[in-house]
């Protein structure tokens, strides 16, 4: 029996009650008299998350998130799926099962995300059907290939049909989509979107029946702009390990209240709303629901005192109470990047100057813009211009085909050195940004030797964070990974970076489904026109 002030997410009122638990579920809730200082609320649900972005395997993620009140998450494992296919999804499900946290998964709908890049796997409609029938899979994952949906592509529509035939939701991904095209997209069966960046976008999509997720992660932080727009869910999407140490859904709730969202509404956005949409048994304190709840000090600060899952205490004042198992060992995915001459990173041009397209990054946003710049040409090679903050960027196919594409990027601020990563959404090829090709190649070689991860290089010095699980995740705990990641960011700042999250920003330069100008292993890509762009032909 647990007693206290409870928040009823059905009615929105708070009253003293005792909760009777039997067999891991709530048996009865009885109103009582008494004065209680704390508030008992349902455990938090992160309704849209890519665990891989934390660089932690699910069992390590759970140990870090549960003390912050997160009892459940709906994870789209399309990062590891792009590297390892269905085997990668199975690894995530198996490792998640070793924790008390209730992980649910969506079947990755876009593996690969587009046909304009090289990925490590392909999941067809038949593979989607197989995944949707797994017990912990609750939806079809975000349908990023919105042009194919709008065009009625047979393969894409077969995946959507597989989910709808099983009465499962289909998550969306429709940045800046509007008008008739948005109507076609929603009419195909897409029910959610987490890519909104303005109140006007939220309003249009909600009017058409979409449920909107306000995203507040480590790279994309849209909650402040969307707080007054009337969103349905609060989600993290992508969260770094250092940020996870500071908070998860509890921190997002604090920000939501700071930005003007009613506290009870905010709690509903991370409990009953996602529970009802995805058909979960957690998310409310009522008979028949899972006995998953959090004791907090107030509905403003959301300081988590205790966490219960299935009626059992799992965290107390920030301390995880469950002894961690060794997790599930994943087969490593080696980096198949053949050795290459450094000249392959160069961009050739005739004359003394070249006019080029440049990717312009926006700090805290996944959307990029396109700039046009005139750069010097020396010995037939187009040069970076650190005085204008225009650096080189290259993407190297990591799956053995030998593709290398190069371009230019603005906004990183590096004055020396290079940074590189095998975390490069969504195909997770190897991406590198730098001042000169020699150091860029050195960064690539270090990652090849490490088996994947993140690296920053300057002269003879470097910092590396190894990510041996598919080149995406560590099998260490959050403290170890956060410390290594913090060292990398500090070193990168010393190289001149002015971004709040340079590695996260770099990892999205190759995401060919978020506007506007991106780069994959086959070249520059115009997301809105959904086509490869020539670097120098305007």
From Swiss-Prot:
Family, per entry: Belongs to the metallo-dependent hydrolases superfamily. Adenine deaminase family.
Matches recorded under NCBIfam families: ade
InterPro entries: Adenine_deam (IPR006679), Adenine_deam_C (IPR026912), Amidohydro-rel (IPR006680), Metal-dep_hydrolase_composite (IPR011059), Metal_Hydrolase (IPR032466)
GO molecular function, one term: adenine deaminase activity
Cofactor: Mn(2+)
Keywords of this entry: Hydrolase, Manganese
Catalytic reactions on record: adenine + H2O + H(+) = hypoxanthine + NH4(+)
A Gene Ontology BP annotation from the UniProt entry: adenine catabolic process
Taxonomic path: Archaea, Methanobacteriati, Methanobacteriota, Methanomada group, Methanobacteria
The organism of origin for this protein: Methanothermobacter thermautotrophicus (strain ATCC 29096 / DSM 1053 / JCM 10044 / NBRC 100330 / Delta H)
EC number: 3.5.4.2
Protein name: Adenine deaminase
Annotated coiled-coil segments of the chain: none
Keyword Manganese belongs to the record: yes
